[in-house]
Every structure is written in structure tokens, then in C-alpha cells.
């Protein structure tokens, strides 16, 4: 009985002492991971919102940048648009339509081929 009692308390403090520093380090790690996660999250929000629609908070950041990009693009677009239309109105529209049709046909063929496989 004495041996069992001695082994129990001896075994008990050992895992306890080893567990203490682990929980301490894990706490510090969690704090680090949390701050890193927040930073990576905000960065991901910046990159993701421009390529795909993201939730409200991240959208607020890119809005001014998108607005500033659109402002200079609008007048230049307006200036080049009427010139292009007047010069190659029919030709450009026909070429675009033909190209689009070819692309859709290719995509349909590929998708149907994949489905058959």
C-alpha cells in the first residue's frame, strides 16, 4: 500500500508539472496565433474583396481604392469609346460575337467530354 501511495503522488506531480508549462506556452501561442489570424484575416479580406464579394467590414477598405481607380478610368473610357464605335462599329461587334460563340462551343465540347468520362 505504501508503494502504491508513493507512486501515485510521484506520478501525479510529474504530469502536473509538465502540463503547467505546456498550458502556459499554449496560452502564449494562442495569443500569437490570434493576432496573426486577425492580421491574415484582414489581409485576406483586402485581397478577396477585390476578386470576389466579401462581407461588409472588409468591403469598406477597398471601396475608396476602387473609387479612385474608376474616377480616372471613366473619362479616358468615354473619350476612347465613341472613337472606336465610329471607326469599327459593325466589324468590332461582329468579330466579338464570332469569338464569343467559338469560345462557348469549345467550352461546351470540353464539359460534355468530361461528363462522358
Curated annotation (Swiss-Prot):
Residues 1-117 are annotated as: Disordered. This is Nuclear transition protein 2. GO terms for molecular function: DNA binding; metal ion binding. Plays a key role in the replacement of histones to protamine in the elongating spermatids of mammals. In condensing spermatids, loaded onto the nucleosomes, where it promotes the recruitment and processing of protamines, which are responsible for histone eviction. The histone H2AB1-H2BC1/TH2B dimer is required for loading of TNP2 onto chromatin. GO terms for cellular component: male germ cell nucleus; nucleosome; nucleus. A motif (Nuclear localization signal) lies at residues 90-98. GO terms for biological process: acrosome reaction; binding of sperm to zona pellucida; flagellated sperm motility; penetration of zona pellucida; positive regulation of protein processing; sperm DNA condensation; spermatogenesis. The modification Phosphoserine is found at residue 112. It is found in: Nucleus; Chromosome. Zn(2+) binds at residues 12, 14, 16, 24, 32, 34, 38, 41. Keywords: Chromosome, Developmental protein, Differentiation, DNA-binding, Metal-binding, Nucleosome core, Nucleus, Phosphoprotein, Spermatogenesis, Zinc. Belongs to the nuclear transition protein 2 family. The gene is Tnp2. Pfam families: TP2 (PF01254). It comes from Mus musculus. Disruption phenotype: Male mice lacking both Tnp1 and Tnp2 are completely infertile, but protamine alone are capable of histone eviction. A significant proportion of Prm2 remains unprocessed. Chromatin in mature spermatozoa shows defects in density. It comes from the Eukaryota. Residues 60-77, 93-117 have a biased composition (Basic residues). Residues 7-26, 44-53 have a biased composition (Low complexity). The lineage of its organism: Eukaryota, Metazoa, Chordata, Craniata, Vertebrata.
Amino acid at each position: 500500500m505504501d508503494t502504491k501511495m508513493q507512486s501515485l503522488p510521484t506520478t501525479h506531480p510529474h504530469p502536473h508539472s509538465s502540463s503547467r508549462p505546456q498550458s502556459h506556452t499554449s496560452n502564449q501561442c494562442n495569443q500569437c496565433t490570434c493576432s496573426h489570424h486577425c492580421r491574415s484575416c484582414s489581409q485576406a479580406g483586402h485581397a478577396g474583396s477585390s476578386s470576389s464579394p466579401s462581407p461588409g467590414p472588409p468591403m469598406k477598405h477597398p471601396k475608396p481604392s476602387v473609387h479612385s481607380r474608376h474616377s480616372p478610368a471613366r473619362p479616358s473610357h468615354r473619350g476612347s469609346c465613341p472613337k472606336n464605335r465610329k471607326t469599327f462599329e459593325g466589324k468590332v461587334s461582329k468579330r466579338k460575337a464570332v469569338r464569343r460563340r467559338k469560345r462557348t462551343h469549345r467550352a461546351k465540347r470540353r464539359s460534355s467530354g468530361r461528363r462522358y468520362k
